[in-house]
């Protein structure tokens, strides 16, 4: 059962697609106050578990820390960070009482889950203008499925998007991208996509191509497609301020950019220099910006990734002026050294909270200050693209994922987990985010395999790939200036060929399970506790996940480990894809086990009485031969495999 409570005058986020009447009175759970903003307080038992919050730090059970829904350009995903790129305000409390909460509020929202008081869950925000949805069900899984029904169907990508992709910030010329593609093809390592970061553009201007590097971009796109490679360019949120740049001039002429309070176009520095932000919360501006994707689609592009759309800001003219004044007042003509405060002031120029209060959106003729609806920007930038795709190429699927998001964006694209680091702990963080994101409708997701920032290691890339084999988005991505981490850069390339090849062997299963989850408003990845509800120990397990209804995954995420401990809540078949192409299968009883997993092996566990389809390796998704599909798992088990043309919208 779902009940909706309305407080004040909420902003319509379009997160919910089902019409639900407002209930009278107050929720049956917790205590609500609307004095000095909004607060919800609930007393937890010691054994209560709290799930959800989508893309957020720490564990699957969110107890013991504080989190903010405040879409942030945050490249350091350490445990102290309380907000990342997304705002996913859905939680499920499981224990003495089991219920779910979705707080439909587009500004900054704080979840104190046993941080200030270990027994109290407290949700607070500045304004008492929101919708609160209270969902009751028998189990957390039941509650999630009810929530998924009211937020709409998850985005469905083209089938090629389930292949492997290579990316690196720093690829600039046609030869750079060609070298990456050829490096995989020449070493017989399967690949479907090469991603284009910001350097393909002319001066970092959206919807442009550097003509010197790509004199005939359409021919280049076709050249890559002949190799079985889809090029996937990045689009950023900021439009460069430059006379003669038509996107800029059109936006200014039609008042499609976010405004300062005085009505002038708001200015912020991002990659191109000074930029304006398209007012994607304005329906006309959103349609205008979305239509610009056609410029690249007309050249043969069929996939994009949206970035910097929290929106990220390096600085603003106002912030720079304030810094200059501070330096003048405190350090000019003075003999003493500046001290650390000057450094803090300089660092505070980027993504300064005060700057998010300096600009406004025009929504149905109403001027809305940005910080009040901050978490909707990335969502609506990707919505702009998704709505435009339906008009530009009706009936065709496009690959699309974003960095920033809010519940509702899951209908238009996926997300990647942002600028992680080449740290072993981030394999585990990647794993733990998967079910939380699925709870909020984000099925097409994955991390930068091998790590984006910092220098990676061969063993880290292999272990991370062995998790990435299972995530819908499987992409190796790294930052400018870091160690090159394409699979062909390391010794014993055959190990990478094998591990990535396992992905292609599993595509018949992974695509089928993704589509079942999308079409049935379900989860692809689940915590063990969602299925094994009577198993108290399963609630404690956070480094193993159920994938679909047939398998459990348990990656190795510790350097120098020869294997790992696993807990089996029932008898399962331990399966390893071995480097010689064979598959080992061993029945293990319910309970605790240590399993050996070499660096060049990919493990999974098949649940009792189940089986999954496995194909032969192919170099691209479209080259997977259905005639080679066979079943592995328990003898006599059946599997209902979903398939389609992988291109047409549903």
Where are these regions (language model features)?
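Catalytic and substrate-binding clefts that recognize carbohydrates or anionic sugar/phosphate headgroups
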Residues: 1-158, 168-170, 174, 181-186, ...
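Extracellular structured ligand-interaction cores
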Residues: 37, 85-89, 96-98, 106, ...
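Glycine-rich, histidine-containing beta strand-loop boundary motifs that form or position
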Residues: 42-44, 55, 94, 102-105, ...
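A residue-level signal for conserved active-site and pocket-lining positions in enzyme catalytic cores
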Residues: 90, 147, 184, 224, ...
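Short acidic-glycine loop/turn motifs at beta-strand connectors
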Residues: 92-97, 260-262, 569-570, 579
């Amino acid at each position: 059962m779902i009940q909706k409570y309305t407080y004040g005058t909420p902003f319509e986020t379009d997160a919910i697609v089902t019409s639900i009447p407002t209930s009278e009175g107050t929720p049956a759970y917790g205590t609500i106050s609307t004095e000095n903003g909004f607060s919800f307080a609930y007393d937890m038992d010691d054994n209560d578990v709290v799930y959800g919050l989508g893309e957020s730090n720490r564990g699957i059970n969110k107890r013991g820390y504080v989190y903010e829904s405040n879409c942030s350009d945050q490249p350091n995903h350490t445990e102290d960070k309380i907000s990342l790129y997304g705002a996913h305000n859905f939680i499920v409390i499981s224990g003495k009482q089991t219920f779910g909460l979705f707080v439909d509020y587009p500004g900054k929202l704080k979840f104190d889950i046993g941080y200030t008081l270990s027994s109290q869950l407290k949700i607070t925000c500045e304004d008492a203008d929101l919708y609160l949805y209270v969902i009751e069900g028998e189990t957390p899984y039941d509650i999630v499925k009810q929530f998924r029904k009211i937020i709409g169907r998850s985005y469905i990508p083209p089938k090629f998007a389930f292949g492997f992709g290579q990316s690196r910030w720093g690829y600039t010329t046609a030869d750079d991208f060609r070298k990456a593609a050829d490096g995989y093809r020449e070493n017989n390592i399967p690949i479907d996509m090469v991603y284009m970061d910001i350097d393909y553009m002319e001066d970092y201007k959206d919807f442009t191509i550097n003509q010197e590097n790509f004199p005939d971009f359409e021919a280049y796109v076709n050249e890559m497609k002949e190799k079985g490679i889809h090029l996937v360019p990045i689009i950023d949120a900021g439009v460069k301020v430059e006379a003669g740049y038509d996107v800029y001039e059109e936006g200014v002429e039609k008042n499609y950019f976010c405004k300062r309070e005085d009505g002038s176009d708001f200015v912020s520095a991002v990659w191109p220099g000074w930029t304006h932000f398209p007012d994607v919360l304005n329906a006309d501006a959103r349609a205008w910006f979305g239509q610009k994707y056609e410029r690249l689609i007309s050249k043969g592009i069929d996939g994009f990734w949206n970035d910097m759309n929290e929106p990220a800001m390096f600085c603003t003219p106002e912030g720079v002026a304030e810094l200059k004044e501070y330096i003048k007042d405190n350090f000019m003509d003075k003999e003493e050294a500046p001290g650390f405060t000057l450094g803090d002031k300089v660092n505070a120029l980027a993504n300064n909270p005060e700057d998010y209060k300096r600009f406004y959106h025009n929504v149905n003729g109403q001027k809305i200050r940005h910080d009040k609806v901050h978490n909707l920007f990335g969502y609506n930038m990707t919505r702009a693209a998704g709505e435009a795709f339906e008009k530009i190429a009706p009936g065709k699927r496009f690959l699309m994922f974003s960095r920033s998001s809010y519940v509702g964006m899951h209908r238009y694209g996926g997300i990647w987990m942002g600028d992680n680091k080449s740290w072993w702990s981030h394999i585990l963080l990647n794993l733990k985010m998967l079910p939380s994101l699925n709870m909020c409708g984000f099925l097409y997701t994955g991390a930068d395999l091998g790590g984006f920032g910092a220098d990676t290691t061969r063993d880290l890339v292999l272990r991370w790939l062995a998790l990435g084999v299972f995530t819908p988005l499987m992409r190796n991505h790294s930052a400018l200036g870091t160690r090159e981490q394409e699979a062909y850069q390391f010794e014993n390339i055959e190990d990478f060929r094998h591990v990535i090849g396992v992905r292609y062997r599993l595509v018949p299963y992974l695509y089928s399970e993704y589509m079942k989850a999308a079409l049935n408003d379900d989860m692809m990845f689940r915590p063990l506790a969602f299925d094994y509800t009577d198993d108290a120990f399963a609630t404690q397990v956070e480094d193993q996940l159920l994938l679909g209804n047939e398998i459990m995954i348990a990656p190795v995420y510790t350097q120098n480990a020869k294997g790992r401990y696993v807990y089996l809540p029932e008898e399962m078949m331990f399966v390893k894809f071995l480097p010689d192409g064979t598959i080992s299968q061993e029945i293990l009883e319910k309970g605790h086990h240590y399993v050996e997993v070499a660096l060049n092996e990919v493990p999974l566990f098949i649940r009792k009485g189940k089986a999954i389809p496995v194909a032969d390796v192919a170099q691209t998704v479209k080259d997977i031969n259905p005639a080679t599909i066979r079943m592995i798992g328990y003898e006599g088990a059946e599997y209902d495999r979903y398939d389609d043309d992988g291109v047409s919208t549903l």
